[in-house]
C-alpha cells in the first residue's frame, strides 16, 4: 500500500478491506447519494478486527497528543457502536503507553436512563470535572455527536475532542436538494460550532492514496469522481 500513509493507517486500511469493513461497488447512503465505497464499522466484530480498530484508534489518539496537544482523562463511547470501542481503546492505550495512559478511564451512555440500582444515563467513570474524548465510527450528519456532547456537559464533563474511524470529507446534503452547491462537512460544522478538535484514523484522501495498490482502475476512478463531486469546503 501507499508509502505516503503512516504504517498504522496502512495496517488499518488493509484490515478493513480484508475484513469486509470497507467495500467498493455501488451503495445508496441515507442522503440518497450513490457512493462507490461503503464503510461499515459494525463488521469489526472478530478478535482480529477488534484488535485492528482499537490499535488504530489508540495510535491516532497518541499521535494527536504528541502533535496537536490533545489532552483528556476519559474515553467516551456513545451508544451503541461507541460502547465496545471505548473499552477496547482504553485497554489498548494502556498497553501501548503504560507510563502515560494506564490511568485513562472509559464511560458510555445508555439510550434510556436506568431508574434502579445506580441509575442514571452514564456507565463507567464519572464525567464531572473531567476532560472527555469522544470516540465513534463516523460522523454523518453530526446529530448523534451533538447529543453526546450535550450529555457530557450535563454531567459536568469538558469535551476535549472527537476521534472517528473515517472522515468522508463530504459536504452535507443541501437543504434544497441541489448538490451542485458548495458546502461544509458535518465534521467541519461540529468543529466550528463547538470549537473542538476532531481527528480521524482515515480520510477519503487516505483511502484513495492507499487503494491505488489494490483496487481496480474503475473503482479508483469512480471514487475520485465522487470525491470531486461531493468534497466539502472545509
From Swiss-Prot:
It comes from the Eukaryota. 5-phospho-alpha-D-ribose 1-diphosphate binds at residues 30, 80-81, 110-111, 114, 116, 136-144. Orotate binds at residues 38-39, 140, 168. Belongs to the purine/pyrimidine phosphoribosyltransferase family. PyrE subfamily. Gene3D superfamilies: 3.40.50.2020. The lineage of its organism: Eukaryota, Fungi, Dikarya, Ascomycota, Pezizomycotina. GO terms for biological process: 'de novo' pyrimidine nucleobase biosynthetic process; 'de novo' UMP biosynthetic process; pyrimidine ribonucleoside biosynthetic process. It holds the Pfam family Pribosyltran. GO terms for cellular component: cytoplasm. It comes from Metarhizium anisopliae. This is Orotate phosphoribosyltransferase. Pathway: Pyrimidine metabolism; UMP biosynthesis via de novo pathway; UMP from orotate: step 1/2. HAMAP family: PyrE.
Amino acid at each position: 500500500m501507499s508509502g505516503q500513509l503512516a504504517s498504522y493507517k496502512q495496517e488499518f486500511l488493509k484490515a478493513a478491506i480484508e475484513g469486509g469493513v470497507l467495500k467498493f461497488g455501488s451503495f445508496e447512503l441515507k442522503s440518497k447519494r450513490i457512493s462507490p465505497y461503503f464503510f461499515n464499522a459494525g463488521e469489526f466484530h472478530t478478535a482480529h478486527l477488534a484488535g485492528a480498530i482499537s490499535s488504530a484508534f489508540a495510535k491516532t489518539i497518541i499521535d494527536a497528543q504528541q502533535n496537536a496537544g490533545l489532552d483528556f482523562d476519559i474515553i467516551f463511547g456513545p451508544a451503541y457502536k461507541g460502547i465496545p470501542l471505548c473499552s477496547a481503546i482504553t485497554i489498548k492505550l494502556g498497553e501501548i503507553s503504560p507510563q502515560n495512559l494506564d490511568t485513562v478511564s472509559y464511560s458510555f451512555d445508555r439510550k434510556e436512563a436506568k431508574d434502579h440500582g445506580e441509575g442514571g444515563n452514564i456507565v463507567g467513570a464519572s464525567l464531572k470535572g473531567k476532560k472527555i474524548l469522544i470516540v465513534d465510527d463516523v460522523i454523518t450528519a453530526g446529530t448523534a455527536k451533538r447529543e453526546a456532547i450535550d450529555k457530557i456537559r450535563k454531567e459536568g464533563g469538558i469535551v476535549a475532542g472527537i476521534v472517528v474511524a473515517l472522515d468522508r470529507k463530504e459536504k452535507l446534503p443541501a437543504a434544497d436538494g441541489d448538490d451542485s452547491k458548495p458546502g461544509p462537512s458535518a465534521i467541519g460544522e461540529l468543529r466550528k460550532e463547538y470549537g473542538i478538535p476532531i481527528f480521524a484514523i482515515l480520510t477519503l484522501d487516505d483511502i484513495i492514496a492507499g487503494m491505488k495498490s489494490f483496487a481496480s482502475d474503475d473503482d479508483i476512478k469512480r471514487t475520485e469522481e465522487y470525491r470531486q463531486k461531493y468534497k466539502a469546503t472545509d
